[in-house]
Amino acid sequence: MRRVRIVSRHVSEAFEIESTSGSDEQRIVRLRVPLSSRFFEGHFDGMPMLPGVAQVVAIAHREAERVFGPLSAPTRMSRLKFQDVIKPGDALSLSLTRERGAETIVRFRIERLLAEGPRVASSGTIAYTNRES
């Protein structure tokens, strides 16, 4: 099996973390997408939207590592759903839930925080092999 290494350079400048709350296994991260995020370059002129890969890698995976500590490279991603467009300037809520067993599973849900109420933008599951002690 070929492993894919996720590189998240320039990610720290891509999203503004406003707050983090929750317990050891469940976290809520509030963040904002800057108007000038590099992720919108070429995606798409006249109607910028955050690419799905940025939602999974730059938001869900990176924030899982920040709040839960170092994780191994992801072994698989499943149940990925992209339900709404994330736009420049959007306020977001990221819910992360970690389950540990034979492998570590992180479930994520990204919601756009709109005046009329939250709307799910994306969700899914990322699996990681457990690090050997």
Please report, for each region that a protein language model flagged, where it lies by residue.
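Catalytic strand-loop segment that frames the active site of acyl-thioester-processing enzymes
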Residues: 6-50
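N-terminal amphipathic/basic-hydrophobic helices that include classical n-h-c signal peptides
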Residues: 1-5
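Hydrophobic residues in beta-strands and at strand termini
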Residues: 31-33, 82, 128
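HotDog/MaoC-like acyl-thioester-processing domains
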Residues: 15, 22-26, 88, 97-133
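Hydrophobic beta-strand-centered segment that forms part of the acyl-chain substrate-binding groove
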Residues: 60-95, 105
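Residue-level signal for inorganic ion chemistry
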Residues: 52, 96
